[in-house]
Amino acid sequence: MPSEFSGKHVTVAGLGVSGVPAAKVLHGLGAQVTVVNDGDDERARTQAAELEPLGVTVRLGDGDTLPEGTELIVTAPGWKPTKPLFTAAGQAGVPVWGDVELAWRLRGLNGRKPAPWLAVTGTNGKTTTVQMLASILKAAGLRTAAVGNIGVSLLDAVTGEQEYDVLAVELSSYQLHWAPSLRAHSAAVLNLAPDHLDWHGSMEAYAADKGRIYEGNHVACVYNVADKATEDLVRAADVEEGCRAIGFTLGTPGPSQLGVVEGLLVDRAFVEDRQKNAQELAEVSDVNPPAPHNIANALAAAGLARAFGVSAAAVRDGLRAFTPDAHRIAHVADVDGVAYVDDSKATNTHATEASLAAYESIVWIAGGLAKGATFDELVAGAAKRLRGAVLIGADRALIREALARHAPEVPVVDLDRTDTGAMLQAVQEARRLARPGDTVLLAPACASMDMFTNYNQRGDAFAQAVRELGA
């Protein structure tokens, strides 16, 4: 049992996905654990009832007051740094960790050899890239898992019985903010666009938290050649001596880059004499789906895998074996020569821009909660691809106004309803606008909570409506 936790008074901030496991792990390590939580609803009381028999103290309805005697706070990643709890902790000299920081510090628990982390962040594409990376690592015969915001929890991965050779780790800006000691084997920032600014306070603070993923990297910092902000983060990072900057691009790669040449994914980074040579990794058609932004995800995953010494054949086999999650550019059906594609996961303009760029002639279903987003740049860039648009949700007027300014010739159907049944009508209206060869694309550019529980339910409603068309 690590002596640093035995008898220590630790406050866990927030019940839920990360709080309950953190409380259990810390209690098991001998800490005196108090959990504080803002809410006092039925779910919170159920979780409290799970912890209290272990000897964990749970305080519901007050997440702002620092418990007396606290020596360490372990926080859920979504808790804002400006909360009074953290202000009080700062004044008292109490350190604050996130669940990722805790997992990082527990990697060598019980004398086990710590598994290296290959870490991924970015505004969009994190989950897909980490899943691709895990598929490639498995194809190489390595014991691995996709962890972090997906799959196995990080705490379970580092404290459970299963041992790993390497972990593919998805990290959000929230998690990185609270993980000062993280030092990955290699890491990638896929892209940067304004997101979660209400939490971070500014784009500069958001980018700085994303950039923490590069700090102390050992082998490679993988960046997006098309997104200079990601390269700037590499330049600003304090890395281990010998760590390399590795770019990925949808164009022809230069030395120390991965890219695309004549329908092939190629590596000019992890080869001998990279000034002259390149290694074929896979065909573009091996990427599912082969949309431009997904090819970029595949190149980033390949870069991290190659940094870990994985063969070109394993990259190819892993990409071929990969199947994307539901609601991420998922082809639902073809009806009367029209393709219906579900990208409900496109909850912001950056993700939607990538989705719209994947198709030539689109009937676009969009709308929901805008979260302060503006749509002029998105619409202006996609205008020539739009056959029509069907708008749903609370903030649809913002998209309608952008369409009027930048694509006035595009027919728009504005559905003045926010009930879940609106999706069926939206799909029916999209069918009316579409022509054979078109794609009806659900890429909302907005959050879903005005009409649905989450983006999964929204995507399910779309898929069900499409199935009814073909019935």
From Swiss-Prot:
One of its GO terms (cellular component) is cytoplasm. It catalyses: UDP-N-acetyl-alpha-D-muramoyl-L-alanine + D-glutamate + ATP = UDP-N-acetyl-alpha-D-muramoyl-L-alanyl-D-glutamate + ADP + phosphate + H(+). Belongs to the MurCDEF family. It is found in: Cytoplasm. The keyword Isomerase does not apply. InterPro entries: Folylpolyglutamate_synth_CS, Mur-like_cat_sf, Mur_ligase_C, Mur_ligase_C_dom_sf, Mur_ligase_cen, MurD. This is UDP-N-acetylmuramoylalanine--D-glutamate ligase. ATP binds at G122, T123, N124, G125, K126, T127, T128. Its main location: cytoplasm. It comes from Streptomyces coelicolor (strain ATCC BAA-471 / A3(2) / M145). NCBIfam families: murD. Keywords: ATP-binding, Cell cycle, Cell division, Cell shape, Cell wall biogenesis/degradation, Cytoplasm, Ligase, Nucleotide-binding, Peptidoglycan synthesis. SUPFAM superfamilies: MurCD N-terminal domain (SSF51984), MurD-like peptide ligases, catalytic domain (SSF53623), MurD-like peptide ligases, peptide-binding domain (SSF53244). One of its GO terms (biological process) is cell wall organization.
